[in-house]
A protein has these predicted regions:
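Short loop/turn segments that flank or connect secondary-structure elements
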Residues: 1-171
């Protein structure tokens, strides 16, 4: 069972209800708000297991402040144990799924949080939805960000983030 931060809840946030594909259970494509969202989940008691089992990282980590709620930050943050490159000793990473505007990668909150994880050699990924129903596209950030983060050069960090976003947008 996932441990959740006491007193923290989704509230008006519906980021996961629109970002993720939920097939075949709800026939809901990625990037579209679930048809059952009505100022809250209209099928909460009978929602599919995939919805029942999902908790974004903001609900799990008290270190992420209230401004990290996905609808406020522009990111759905998730832990991951898949696709971690072999050269990482830490086998659990973080995926920052860009949910809002691309400019969210320029926020101090994002840069500081990602930089802190990169400094600890946590595998950090950036993910975006592809056009149409093309699914998600993900890129590892940690390796390319290590030098800029360790040198504390914000302009280089921002340049790497923009290059990574451009790369996955072009895929």
């Amino acid at each position: 069972m996932v441990a959740l931060v006491p007193g923290r809840g989704c509230g008006e946030c519906n980021a996961c209800c629109s970002y993720f594909e939920i097939l075949p259970e709800l026939n809901k494509p990625s990037g579209k708000l679930c048809q059952h969202w009505k100022a809250g989940c209209g099928i909460y008691e009978s929602r599919p297991g995939v919805c029942r089992d999902f908790f974004c990282y903001w609900l799990q980590d008290a270190a992420l402040g209230d401004d990290w709620r996905p609808d406020k930050s522009g990111f759905i943050v998730q832990e991951t144990v898949t696709d971690i490159p072999a050269h990482f000793s830490i086998r659990k990473g973080l995926v920052f799924r860009l949910y809002g505007e691309d400019s969210a990668i320029d926020s101090e909150r994002f840069i500081e949080t990602v930089s802190a994880q990169v400094e600890k050699r946590v595998p950090v990924f950036l993910s975006v939805l592809g056009p149409g129903n093309a699914g998600t596209r993900t890129i590892l950030l940690t390796d390319d960000l290590t030098g800029p983060v360790l040198s504390r050069r914000r302009e280089r960090i921002v340049a790497v983030l923009h290059a990574a976003l451009a790369t996955i947008r072009a895929q």
